[in-house]
Amino acid sequence: MTKRTFQPNNRRRARKHGFRARMRTRAGRAILSARRGKNRAELSA
């Protein structure tokens, strides 16, 4: 049987997809801006 590929880890999740990770790059800031434009309840992980 194959192993499950999703092995949850909150630190990795935040570092890769968190707010500060998004703010670090221009593309990431564009993502946040788009999510604000859609009035998303959560902007990032």
From Swiss-Prot:
Keywords: Ribonucleoprotein, Ribosomal protein. Transmembrane segments: none annotated. GO terms for biological process: translation. GO terms for molecular function: structural constituent of ribosome. The keyword Ribosomal protein applies. GO terms for cellular component: ribonucleoprotein complex; ribosome. It holds the Pfam family Ribosomal_L34. Residues 10-27 have a biased composition (Basic residues). InterPro entries: Ribosomal_bL34, Ribosomal_bL34_CS. Residues 1-45 are annotated as: Disordered. It comes from the Bacteria. Belongs to the bacterial ribosomal protein bL34 family. This is Large ribosomal subunit protein bL34. It comes from Micrococcus luteus (strain ATCC 4698 / DSM 20030 / JCM 1464 / CCM 169 / CCUG 5858 / IAM 1056 / NBRC 3333 / NCIMB 9278 / NCTC 2665 / VKM Ac-2230). The gene is rpmH.
